[in-house]
Amino acid sequence: MIFDKDDFKAYDADLWNAIAKEEERQQNNIELIASENVVSKAVMAAQGSILTNKYAEGYPGRRYYGGTDVVDVVETLAIERAKEIFGAKFANVQPHSGSQANCAAYMSLIEPGDTVMGMDLAAGGHLTHGAPVSFSGQTYNFLSYSVDPETELLDFDAILKQAQEVKPKLIVAGASAYSQIIDFSKFREIADAVGAKLMVDMAHIAGLVAAGLHPSPVPYAHITTTTTHKTLRGPRGGLILTNDEDLAKKINSAIFPGIQGGPLEHVVAAKAVSFKEVLDPAFKEYAANVIKNSKAMADVFLQDPDFRIISGGTENHLFLVDVTKVVENGKVAQNLLDEVNITLNKNSIPYETLSPFKTSGIRIGAAAITARGFGEEESRKVAELIIKTLKNSENEAVLEEVRSAVKELTDAFPLYEE
């Protein structure tokens, strides 16, 4: 028996009500977490499809089970669309997450204990770029590079000097909280100069790369990884790209049977439909609006001397704000904004002096509000509401004004049209 919504509600009211509350929360909140987005109904339909029933260890044409002709078609669609989007010769669409994709990439490029350079977490890197608490930092000898302490920009001369000193087998480029353009060609020059491989994690900027609004790493990286959500607006999952056939074989083996069993073909289907959406000309307009909205919000903060934007601005979908002149730390800011239905996250800033559980900064992203239809005017209004909240944290009347303004915005831009 396949449940419809009424069946589901009657059968498991507790779970139904929890999901309904989350739907209400998303509708009534302004979502600024840079790693979140709003998927289409088509993506949700594919992910909730009957494909969830099918086990399909292996790859199209090379499965361990029978009855896989249809899922082979589904997975091949996802692969071919990913290759078309990013101009790559090979694509693996099976990783369950970006972290799984990174793990498989490392397994394809280096050996345990090898020296690797990755971006410092506080400077904008990611846990899987060598943090001691991550499998990456525990399996490989990661050494972090940072940004210039004055400009807060990547310092390629310093990165080259460090690479010449430590002689890494692999350099990892890409970030989870860096608001400027990354020059991947320079990273490749450094890697070549020291005999290292280059891996790029473009999880945050993949949608901008797909739209031609950020330089692509694919021509320069030996392996490129990404998530399929964030700016790509797809389901939660991972993707690995390469132009090297030998590496493609290693990647496939690293994913299956290396670190995963059967792929989640319902998620692969959701990736496929989201990739079709990315190939639509309308996606480029969406991605351009994401950057416009990010810049519009950043400009409001730049005009207020009580706040400091890391690196002085943004050229992508996100930016970091040092809030310590106004509130105690980023965690306090995050909690205050939660109370007025604005959702974002505390975030470390370069050369952070506070713990990662408190932080000096907050991270603000424009992908989700742009998906709802917010424009530059609404984005500026959102930034003003953030500032108003943080500067009036003890004034309940002002906070209620902010809540009302948030409600007006979310009502004007529904999460999904009926």
Swiss-Prot record:
Q: Which cofactor does it need?
A: pyridoxal 5'-phosphate
SUPFAM superfamilies reported in the protein's UniProt record: PLP-dependent transferases
Q: Where is this site: Plays an important role in substrate specificity?
A: 229
Modified residue annotations for N6-(pyridoxal phosphate)lysine: 230
The record's subcellular locations are:
Cytoplasm
Q: Which GO terms describe its cellular component?
A: cytosol
EC code(s) of this entry: 2.1.2.1
- What does the entry list as the binding residues for (6S)-5,6,7,8-tetrahydrofolate? 121, 125-127, 355-357
Q: What is this protein called?
A: Serine hydroxymethyltransferase
